[in-house]
């Protein structure tokens, strides 16, 4: 009985849905700390450290070969997904990217094309697809899972603005300016407010995870998590920047764990072994920041 309580406690600390949606939404309205935004260049350090950590990542569980669809972040293209693509292929997955060029905002032409690609991969492989999206790509991933849940095995967001509201003050000025330039003169709210409402009211009935960083300088941690409305959603913390999430060894470690679960046998994220102990200690430290 004692061991069961300890396991539950660990799961609650790192991989359980937020229970107070109102409080989470209120905190999601705050912008990221300026110091985190100014230090986003540390993503280059995460990229530089990745080759040194590859031997550890090669010890992560191999997958069963099911297809994985990757979606890039805002203003980014498939080229930014090379780290995730190479790693997931090394774990045995059939990896595809969205193939739609630069992500210039949440737009109908992209949502329709992404859903078509999701259905195509499902048909081609005769297996359900895991959809992983970085930043704005995570909103696309959840939206696609909402539109075609019968095709989706898991959906994972990486530092995605899942809970931005109509309060534009929470959006960093640079992001706001880029969105106005590439997508819409009104900024992110023009496209995303109605999408978020739909996602939060009726999340896809598939296993889902929001991976977030407490020191994200673009999307604040509370905005990158969502309130779980079913028993298979989890919010998972990782250390790092926003711009480095696609090359972050901790992200890859978590993804390998989540994607390797047998289909239909979902369990919450529970760090194991030496890396698990290090993760636990780092998570405790992060809560004091």
Question: How would you name each of these model-derived features?
Answer:
Residues 62, 106, 132, 163, ...:
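Residue-level signal for alpha-helical context at structural boundaries
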Residues 29-31, 61, 142, 205, ...:
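N-terminal hydrophobic alpha-helix used for membrane targeting or insertion
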Residues 204-289:
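C-terminal catalytic-base region of ester-bond hydrolases, centering on the histidine
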Residues 1-68, 81, 86, 91, ...:
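Flexible, membrane-associating and regulatory peripheral segments of lipid-active enzymes
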Residues 66-79, 83, 89-205, 211, ...:
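Serine-dependent carboxylesterase/thioesterase catalytic core
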Residues 47-50, 120, 180, 184, ...:
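A structural signal for alpha-helix termini and helix-coil/disorder junctions
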